[in-house]
Amino acid sequence: MTHIHDLSVREQAAAIRGRELSPVDIAEHYLDRIDRLADRVGAYVTVTADLARDQAKTAERAVMAGEEAPLLGVPIPVKDLNMVKDVRTTLGSAAFADFTAFTDDNVVAFLRQAGTILLGKTNTPEFGLPCYTENDVAPPARTPWDLERSAGGSSGGAAAAVAAGLAPAAHGSDGGGSIRIPTSVCGLFGIKPTRGRISQGPIVPDLVGLSTSGPITRTVRDAALLLDVMAGNAPGDMYRAAPPEGTFLEAADRAPGRLRVGRTAVPPVSAAQVHPDCLAAYEAASELLAELGHEVEDIDTPWKEELMPHFEVLWASMATMTPVPPDREERLRPLTRYLRERGNAITAPQLLRAQAALQLAVRTGLPRLDQYDVILQPTLALPPVPVGYFDEVGPEENFVRQTLFTPFTSVYNVTGQPAVNVPLHWTDGGLPIGVMLAGRMGDEATLIALSAQLEEARPWAHRHPPIWD
C-alpha cells in the first residue's frame, strides 16, 4: 500500500493538480506523523499545525479555482535559522526561545509564492555553528537509520524530518557543509548551491559569502524543482549567481554527456583519517562513474592545511554576528560561548587578512580544478557518530572533533562552488554514507544531470529506515 509520505514532492504536486489528493489530507497526514514520531528523531523545534491547516485549506480553494503554482499545497518545513513572519524562531538557542520573527526571509517568501505549506521550523544547533544538532530547545536530531546516532548539522532536523517521512522535502542551509553533512548521514540528496544563487536577505548579512539556503530531498528531481523555486535575488544582495540556462528540473532530465571527473580522498586536514566505510563509498562511486562512461582521474587537492586557521577566523567571527542580549549570554551553550570569545578577540586587520588569504587560495586553486567538470570526494571522513559524541568533551576539543569529522565540506563554502551529497552507499550495518560532487561556479546543472544519472543507475529513494512504516 502506498502512503502519502511514500510520494515524492513532484508526485504530491501532480496529485494535487489532478485533484487526486487534497492539500488538507496531505497536511493532516504529516501532522499526524509529526505528532507521533518527531521527538524520536528531533526533527522539529516548532510545529505550526494551525497555520499548516489554514494554508492547506487556502491551497485547496486555489486548486478548485484553477490557480497554478509549482508546489501548490505541498508541505515544506523551514530551518529554524530562517525567519517566517509571526512564527517562533529560536535560532537553535535558549537565548531566543521566545523570539517571534517579524518578517519573512526572502527564501521563505519564494517558497510561499510557490504555494508551499509550512509544517513547522526544523531543528538546528545554536546559530547553526556546529555540524551536529543538539541544543537546549528541542531533542537531539537523530538519523532515522540508527536512533543512537546523530543526524548531523546544522540542517539536522530538516534531514531527519525528510528521512523519517515527516516532510516530503525540506529547506536547509549550508555555511560549512550543513546540507551535505546531514544528507550524508540520513541517506538523502542535498544541494549547496552556488554562492548568490539564493537570496540571504532581507535581514541576515552574509559578508563573507559562506552560507546559502538549499534543498534537502529524497530524489534528485525533487531537489532540482525546489532549487528552481528557491533561487532568486533581491535588492541589497551582495552576491548574485549567473542565471542558469533553462530550469534545474530540465537539467535533471538531460543526459550529462561524458564528463571529466577529478577525484581525491585526501583531506585538507592532515590529522583527519578517512574511515574505511567512507572510502568504500568513494571507491564504489568512482567505479560507477567509470561504468557510466565518464573519465575519472586522481588529482591533488589544491587546498592546503594552512588555510584552516583562516577559515576558523571567519567561523569564529560569524559566531559573534548574532546580537545576544547581555542578560541572556549565560543561556548560550559552551561551544557557542567559546566561539564567540574567539571571535570577539579577532581584530579587524586579522579578519581582513584571513579573508585575503582565502581569496588568494581560491584564485590559485580554482583554475586547477576548472579543467574538470566535476570533483568527487567523500562527503565525510566518518560514518554517523553517536549522539553526544561532540559534547562529551570540552569546547576546544569539540571543535577539533568536528573538523576531523567534516574535513572536506567547508572548502566549497569558501570557493562558492555548488556541491551536492549523493546517497549511493550503505554500510553492512545499514548506515548511509554519501559522496560529494562539486562543480564549477554557477554550474549546478551539470551536478544535477550527473546525479540524476547516478540515481537512475543505482536508485536509493526506495530505501527507508525502520521508522518509515
For every predicted segment, state its role.
Residues M1-R53, E291-G293, R463-D469:
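An N-terminal boundary/leader segment
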Residues L71-L91, D253-A265, L314-L366, P378-L382, ...:
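Short helix-loop capping/hinge segments that flank enzyme active sites or metal/cofactor-binding pockets
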Residues T103-A234, N413-G434:
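Short glycine/serine-rich loop segments
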Residues T364-P367, E397-V422:
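Small-aliphatic-rich amphipathic alpha-helix that forms the alpha element of a beta-alpha
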